[in-house]
UniProtKB/Swiss-Prot annotation:
Highest rank taxon of the organism: Eukaryota
Record organism: Anopheles gambiae (African malaria mosquito)
Function: May be part of a membrane-spanning permease system necessary for the transport of pigment precursors into pigment cells responsible for eye color.
Name of the molecule in the record: Protein white
Membrane topology reported for the UniProt record: Multi-pass membrane protein
Pfam families: ABC2_membrane (PF01061), ABC2_membrane_7 (PF19055), ABC_tran (PF00005)
Disordered: annotated span: 1-33
Family, per entry: Belongs to the ABC transporter superfamily. ABCG family. Eye pigment precursor importer (TC 3.A.1.204) subfamily.
Ranges in a coiled coil: none
Residues carrying covalently attached carbohydrate according to the record: N472, N645
UniProt-listed PANTHER family: ABC TRANSPORTER G FAMILY MEMBER 28, PROTEIN WHITE
Primary site of residence: membrane
Record-linked InterPro entries: AAA+_ATPase, ABC2_TM, ABC_transporter-like_ATP-bd, ABC_transporter-like_CS, ABCG_dom, ABCG_transporters, P-loop_NTPase, Pigment_permease/Abcg
Amino acid sequence: MTINTDDQYGDAESKTTISSSRRYSSSSYQDQSMDDALNTTLTNDKATLIQVWKPKSYGSVKGQIPQCERLTYTWKEIDVFGEAPTDGKPREPLCTRLRNCCTRQRKDFNPRKHLLKNVTGVAKSGELLAVMGSSGAGKTTLLNALAFRSPPGVKISPNAVRALNGVPVNAEQLRARCAYVQQDDLFIPSLTTREHLLFQAMLRMGRDVPASVKQHRVQEVLQELSLVKCADTIIGAPGRIKGLSGGERKRLAFASETLTDPHLLLCDEPTSGLDSFMAHSVLQVLKGMAMKGKTIILTIHQPSSELYCLFDKILLVAEGRVAFLGSPYQSAEFFSQLGIPCPPNYNPADFYVQMLAIAPAKEAECRDMIKKICDSFAVSPIAREVLETASVAGKGMDEPYMLQQVEGVGSTGYRSSWWTQFYCILWRSWLSVLKDPMLVKVRLLQTAMVATLIGSIYFGQVLDQDGVMNINGSLFLFLTNMTFQNVFAVINVFSAELPVFLREKRSRLYRVDTYFLGKTIAELPLFIAVPFVFTSITYPMIGLRTGATHYLTTLFIVTLVANVSTSFGYLISCASSSISMALSVGPPVVIPFLIFGGFFLNSASVPAYFKYLSYLSWFRYANEALLINQWSTVVDGEIACTRANVTCPRSEIILETFNFRVEDFALDIACLFALIVLFRLGALLCLWLRSRSKE
């Protein structure tokens, strides 16, 4: 098929007339209001600039956005490169990678692939702009670049300019005025819709906004996005916990981002995984936001013709280049002038995506077609108009006005204080613990069943030669059970929540330390209740040392072990990239510490090259403390001899057999506390490094 690149598409005046009268417009005020918004922001009057960026009040969801507060987002010369492959190249030392991560410095790399090539565009207030293209065309890459959220290993050219109302912005300035709804919906499954939005409102809205205003704002958003009927329904997890439907989850994601009433909204594949009805309802919500004056940019793979009619502008991307940017009416005219008109009664979106896709076995022909289409658009009057609009960034503007403090945002870039962040994380984590049956009911039932089984096996031990060995084995089994039960419980729960943390941290909802402290403190009562149930059942059944002091000491030691193993589980979870990896790493790492516990290998027989590693074994300190508590007060003759020609064991001999000393009891307790602190600090460091690597 031959493309005619000599035809023109009419002058700007006729094109404006066609655009303003096209049937895709939602209301007659949009074209005039968008032109007025752009002209207003291009003035040199500083008073006008101050008016544009003045703090707005919350709760304007249902009303029109004032003209002075509307945003036009422009971008120019966006070039994005992928990271060079490392095959055959030596990897940097660990210390170098840690230093680079801490200082946010990355090594230079040679471009592997030119992902986006000189992309320029504009999105005006009151418009719903849809970015379309085939898989791998660069839609999500472009949206990430516009949101300043490109993943690690992706480099954006320094010449790229992103501007709001003609004023160049950086990541912090855009984040304060923009919301980004990502493709994957990540929530805490056990929370209700209202609880999730209350948590988001407490952290997203300004620190000076009263709590009553935040609660009122949550109710407003629930009504605006038709979430009132499911406000008290748990969110759930698809395929695991019954909860919200796909459309409700997507609207909840919008609700979370629109609590602060941002005037610029970026959405990555908002209809992904939804049926046609749900997809239409979601886009109707976005269309309604645009009609009120918001600027909406979304990516969509292949919309139906019904959805296509909702778009005010479309941006076609192919092979990292802009193939078209304009109204649906202009797109039909553009492709007709090229000699490839959309057939009658055919979905234009399907037609454009097919024309810009790389078909198997026809790569060269398809790439040649894409190149001709992109080249034709680059020299068209539509592209020149877009370039002129995007080129005004910084002209006649006094950039320091963009650097003024946004309402409610502190000097650290967070909208809420440290204490508010900690309180909200603690509140959400505590609700999650109480409402998740796997965390409380199932774990306590499991603990009671295991304790009853162990108590039945070792039931009624007497103080003789066999009883001493059995009691020593049962006490070490206390430690083994507490360790594996809590390590795997933490890995399954904490690792599953890490993606939510990483996304919320990148949105600057809270700090790493507030999240870690709030999360671990909220789960602390559970890790006290589990050893209490276990010890209270097994201790009397086995017949361990009588007396409240001995029982409470055993309970205290077992509780310490439960929290040491929990801390170690946090460390493994934060250092692992996935749940499967953490579950695979956990047992091999725990086994050496178990061997160094003194039951399988005498502490005096530990090889010299493993001596320092044995100091990190909580089995060693806890086993010694438990045996001291059990045998140190046993007097001579209390242990009976049931077999002839056998020396009756004494308490000193029992402890010396393991190379344990009574005077080390206090040191053992101190070491258990030290390991809790050490492992949790290590987990916090790993969590901080992971969050930094994602920014």
